[in-house]
Design a protein with these regions (language model features):
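Terminal amphipathic alpha-helical/low-complexity segments used for targeting or macromolecular assembly
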Residues: 1-64, 166-168
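Left-handed beta-helix
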Residues: 64, 69-70, 75-76, 81-90, ...
Length: 168
């Protein structure tokens, strides 16, 4: 557990040029707090304490402004920069070394049972304000531009221009 905490702190130091040292990150970075909160809520969820997981996740959202459903699967070295307004849905899956900016939604497109949120591959970067909706896949190493609306699969190592992705 301590190794994972240090790994999360070091990830912030590597990905955010404003981060100067571990203590600063641990005390002042809401994205890191949300990831830690999610790891605890997810553990509770997996162990069958679903109500407590939801209550705890709601508390984390109130404190950080970041909503991650406790059932969502989040990989290692996940970093949320700034974070306010981030929403990650129940069936979302996020790979390792993923970075997202503020106001990103990994959401569903309609009410449905089963898989309804996106799967994000390893080493993906998602720009501020992006909306990735539905049970789609964003391939490994892809970069999603700010304010994009993505409703279909994105191949691995794709650097999408927002004009190619935005739909009304």
């Amino acid at each position: 557990m301590i190794k994972r905490i240090i790994e999360d702190l070091d990830t912030a130091l590597q990905k955010d040029p404003s981060a100067r040292y571990r203590l600063e990150v641990a005390l002042t970075f809401p994205g890191v707090h949300a990831v830690w909160g999610h790891r605890i809520a997810h553990l509770l969820w997996r162990r069958g304490f679903k109500l407590f997981a939801r209550i705890y996740a709601n508390w984390v959202r109130a404190v950080t402004g970041i909503e991650i459903h406790p059932a969502a699967r989040i990989g290692r070295r996940f970093f949320i920069d700034h974070g306010m307004g981030v929403v990650i849905g129940e069936t979302a899956e996020v790979g390792d070394d993923v970075m997202i900016y503020h106001d990103v939604t990994l959401g569903s497109r309609k009410y449905a049972k089963g898989k309804r949120h996106p799967t994000i591959g390893d080493r993906v970067v998602i720009g501020a304000g992006a909306r990735i909706l539905g049970p789609i896949t964003v391939g490994e190493g892809a970069r999603i531009s700010a304010n994009s609306v993505v409703t279909s699969d994105i191949p691995a190592r794709t650097n999408q221009d927002e004009s190619e992705l935005f739909s009304i």
